[in-house]
Amino acid sequence: MKMNHLGYATNNIEETISAFLRLGFIKVHPEIKHHVPKNMRIMRVKLGDLIIELMAPADASKPSFVGEKLKTTTEPFVLHHLCYDVDDIHKTVNDLMATGEYGIHEPITDGVFQKNQICFLRHRQIGLIEFFEWPKN
């Protein structure tokens, strides 16, 4: 396993992107991605090897993948998840689920940005963890 990115929820994605750009980060993608199924807007920024995924509700009046996390804090920006690259997502998920420490938050599905497979598990102490399996060429 290798760390891929840190996912943060924010109430104002434009202001948060600007703050990171002023700190020397660069945009990974040219535009904010609107992910309709999860009612969220996403942008990735990076500095060296560090990638931060910024997520904000697209419509605050509707349920959102990140909206519930934002309701638990008065901060405008909060850690949402950790993300790891894995070689075999099915084996990783099965092995971790067998420990009894994880629950499935979202089953294996296609990723938003790349043609990869992702899965979200919830660890009882760590919280939400995303796993990426990159396409085999």
Where are these predicted regions, by residue range?
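Long, hydrophobic N-terminal alpha-helical segment
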Residues: M1-K38
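Vicinal oxygen chelate
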Residues: K2-N12, R41-K46, I52, G67-K91, V93-N137
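Short loop/beta submotifs within extracellular cysteine-rich repeat domains
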Residues: T16, K27-V28, K62-P63, L128-F131
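Hydrophobic side chains in well-ordered alpha-helices
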Residues: T16-A19, T92-L96
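A cross-kingdom feature marking solvent-exposed beta-strand/loop segments within repeated
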Residues: H29-N39, S61-T74, H105-K115
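A short, Lys/Arg-enriched interface patch at domain edges and termini
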Residues: E53-P63
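Beta-hairpin (beta-strand-turn-beta-strand) motif
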Residues: P57-D59, D85-I89, W134
